[in-house]
Amino acid sequence: MECHYSEAQLASLLLPYLERFDENAINGLASELKSHGISVYAAAGFDPNVGSSLTFKKEVPPSDTSILEDVDHVNLYSEQDNFHLSMLDMMDFHTPDIMDIGLFTDVQHEGDPVDELELSSDTRSSLSPSSHNTTTGHETGLSSVTPPQSYWTSDNLVSTRALPTTGDKQLSPQRRTEIADISSLPTCQQISLEPQCHSVMEAPCHGKEVTKRNKRSRTEAQEASNSPCASSTADSQTNPAPLRLRSVFGPGTKYNLSHKSLHEISDISENCIRPDLVEFLEERLTRWKKTGFWHQDQIPEPTASGAGREKLIDAYSCICRLESRMKDDQILNRVAVVMLHTAYEQACQEWRHAGTHQRKGRGRGDATTVIDEILSELHEDWDVGDRKRYHRSRFHDKKRFGKRWLVLIKSLGVGILLCSSQRLASAVYVLPFQITLFILDTNLSESAATRRFLPATCCRRWFAVSNSLRLNSC
């Protein structure tokens, strides 16, 4: 029995199976078609305006040299033969949704998909180019190559378009019943169907191995992330916090911060600013007004001027009293460890300049010797057991924490000691200290008005990111 059909009819018959079934089902379909005297050549092509496409051609004798036509440029025959209709009924033909396909689940919004088909030397052949497209193809029986962006059904052309995403969930593609001009679509709405991984398949008719993999350059990935579609989807998500900030800091105000900046400020405040900041300040300011910041009746205020040695002793003594009497006062502890670090730096410079102490051994310089003398004066159990090692380690830990808080103060202002959340404060006391501050410049970030409200409202855009930079020396 001889069958007459067009390339468009073959495309409408085969493309849905390329999208719906896995490799074994595709090979079985090819074998079934071959039993009816049908063999198909499949060629993959790429056009910057259209994307990936498939071209089908009936297997003909060597004397027939007809040129392949791209499936997107073929006129559909209105009259279809009985064989084609019977094949549709036999195989339960339907048009599946792209998101329901199990074979191609890696769907990305890319305008210029780069799907490279690498062939073995036995399967490589030259094909005639189609209109507006240079086709570099190969001859196989049927293999699950990248499907095109549109395919023919028994009635008309169905185009699969990607809809904008909402969050991490992508909506189902829209099925259109008119001929779609893919080149006129925005770049972010052209869909690219890429295989999930590198795979090697065997062509069912010729037994050839086809190596299929996709490559994507770094430049294209950056262009996709910087596309207007990506920014529009992010801005489309409604966040109530920027809505509250917009009237004060948004566009049109004296600060004139963009919507993106307002979103960042909202996210940062949720993670790095304590949620009870207003209530905390109201309660503490009342107490500090009555008793003083350092509670002078219990803890003497550390010396802010004078020699480094005296300042170091005062700061360390203050820390010891805070831990023994007021362990819950975290604000005072943060200030004290910062003063301990600054006093230690000043004392080290003075000791190096004086050079009064001689090095006693490897790794033990002036600073180590002086610290041991100070700790022995402050702790009565200095010479008991391993208490000497304990006090040394404790002193250097406090000094290290002070240096870390000082890093935050230099970037964010001294107000961070008051408004820091427990999550950010806990990162300071983690060993090793893994934190990086990304401070994104804005037009008003260095203005006096911005610096004035920076500690309380975080209107200078910043964020603490762990596992980015290890400050082991802190």
Swiss-Prot record:
Transmembrane portions of the chain: none
UniProt keywords, alphabetically: Nucleus, Transcription, Transcription regulation
Bias (Low complexity) ranges: 120-131
Entry keyword S-adenosyl-L-methionine: no
Biased composition (Polar residues): 132-153, 222-240
Subcellular location: Nucleus
Region ranges (Disordered): 114-153, 207-242
Regions of compositional bias (Basic and acidic residues) in chain numbering: 207-221
This protein's record includes keyword Ligase: no
Cellular component aspect of the GO annotation: nucleus
Function: Transcription factor; part of the fragmented gene cluster that mediates the biosynthesis of fusarochromene, a tryptophan-derived metabolite closely related to a group of mycotoxins including fusarochromanone.
Family the UniProt entry places it in: Belongs to the POU transcription factor family. Class-3 subfamily.
Protein name in the entry: Transcription factor fscB
Organism in which the protein naturally occurs: Fusarium equiseti
